[in-house]
Structures are given as C-alpha cells and as structure tokens.
Amino acid sequence: MYKQPDKEKWTGRIDSESDEKSFRVHQKIRLLDIGQIQTQAENAFALLGFQCDEGVRRNQGRQGAYHAPVEVKKALANLPWHLPSHTILYDVGEITCEGGELENSQKHLGQAVERLICHNITPVVIGGGHETAYGHYLGVRQAVGSETKLGIINIDAHFDMRPYEQGPSSGTMFRQILDEDGNVGYCCLGIQPLGNTAALFETANRYGCTYVLEEELTLATLERAYEIIDDFIQNYDVLMLTLCMDVLSASAAPGVSAPSPFGLDPKIVRALLRYIISKPQTISFDICEVNPLVDENRKTIALAAAFCMEALVHFHRRQRAATGR
C-alpha cells in the first residue's frame, strides 16, 4: 500500500521566513506523489518511508519500527538546512506493509526505489525493520540491470544471513540476495560476536562475505577500515548502503529491536557514512530498525534523523565535486 506524503509532519521552528540561510528542513521540503515524479538534472533527493516491521515479528524481535518513518521525518523537519538553496528534497510518502504481507510490500518498495533512481533522484529510504534492505535491493537491481556488479555495504551488528526455509524475515535478507543474485557482493561493518552464532560466522565465510568486527572499529583504526572498504568497492560498479541502528551502543540508540551493550559510537558510524557516500558508486541509502515505542526521550529517533541529514549533505558534496554545483 502507498501513502502520499503528509504536510502535517513537516512543521518546526521558524527563524526567518525570507532568509534561506536561516531555514530548516520543513521550510524546504517538497511533497510529491511518487507517481508524479519527473526526471531531475541533478541535486535531487527523496525521502521514502517503509512502514513495516513484519520481518521483525517473524524474527522474534521487538516490534515498533513500523512507526519510525513518520517519527524520523518529524525529527528531520526541525533540523537546519545545510544544503544549497537549489537542492531539491522530496518527501514521497510511505510504502506500508498491511496484513503481514511482507514479500508484497518489499516488491512495492523496490518499484518505488527503482522509479526514483531511474528519474535521477537519490533515494534515502527510512525503515521499518531491516527487511527494508531487501526491498531497497530489489529497486537498485531493477534500476541498474542484472549484469551490473552490485556491492551491498551493511553497517550492522548482525549478519542477517539466517536460513529462510520458513520464510523471509528481518534476519534473512542478505542470504536471500546472495542466493538469488550472482552479481552481488556483501560487506558488513560492526559485527558483534555476541550477536551472531558460530553458525552465522560459518555462513558468512562460506558465502565469501567481507566483514569487520565492532571491536575493530575505533577512531584509531578507521584508516584500516577504509582500506577494507576500498578493497571491497573496487570489485563493484554500483553500491547500496544500509544502516541498521542496532549497530550503535544501547546508550546512544536504546530505541531498537535488539539493543547492543557493546555497540559503535555514533561518531564512528558518522565517519563510515561519510566515507562510503563519498564514493561515486554509492547510489542509495537506507536506515532501519528505529523503534519509537521503546525509545528514550526520542534519542534514537533524533540520531537517525541526524544520520539522514549527514547522508543528504555528503551525497550533495560528492555531486558538487563532480559537477561544480
């Protein structure tokens, strides 16, 4: 099901009604039915929500991520606008999962992502459970074609490579993708040994996945992480980036399905986002697993909104470096 964008969520402080240097996101956002989009020349981005936590339910996690797209957009609304005035940012609404129809909703998400990419609009997808990533992948693959070598970088505490004989969930997506698509590679950053069984490590190794443990990602070791990322990227024509908020320490992101006591510092995640988005191969981004129902003082929601803004700013900086605008 598709929900058109709603102006009511785009409200906030107004420091000036005329000076664009004082504007906030809610003063610049454009609402657009995804069926009405037209091809853009450059500097166009779209926020697309995926209201779904059926995959989390199937994976025996804490439900509530269904509500995240609306809440993250509300938090984004009041952030300062740090993009050039000519930059276009659309809210194109939400794809929703109703009646437990996960697979159908992922298909519809894929169609929406494909439409954005094919109209030269960079998608920023706001989930939802991490089952969002499978729908995101479907759209990227449809947009770039089956012969394009596609790399997936997942910033996550978990491999999400469980068996799926009983059906897909928020813990199976990357195994599904690797089984279905011979032109895909998978890199996971932030893996928690205590969040993955020995069998899942064996699965990741058997599938030839690249991964970096959480304890190996510090400010002192970021350069080594960048080298690993570069080695991975060089094998692919296109990248999609996905961020699961449970990769962060529970003190920074308590509002997730599976909180992590040994998670990453937000500054590490921010550095990884900036670095990966700076690469010309990266064409889309999703952020998942915010659970507003268990959040503390909207802390996780605010952090997710900040990461979305970081993504937008650094996608634009890369485009500006390439085009001079």
UniProtKB/Swiss-Prot annotation:
The keyword S-adenosyl-L-methionine does not apply. It is an enzyme of class 3 (hydrolase). InterPro entries: HutG, Ureohydrolase, Ureohydrolase_dom_sf. This is Formimidoylglutamase. Its cofactor is Mn(2+). It comes from Geobacillus sp. (strain WCH70). It catalyses: N-formimidoyl-L-glutamate + H2O = formamide + L-glutamate. The gene is hutG. Mn(2+) 2 binds at D156, H158, C244, D246. Disulfide bonds: none annotated. Pathway: Amino-acid degradation; L-histidine degradation into L-glutamate; L-glutamate from N-formimidoyl-L-glutamate (hydrolase route): step 1/1. Catalyzes the conversion of N-formimidoyl-L-glutamate to L-glutamate and formamide. Pfam families: Arginase. NCBIfam families: hutG. The keyword Manganese applies. One of its GO terms (molecular function) is formimidoylglutamase activity.
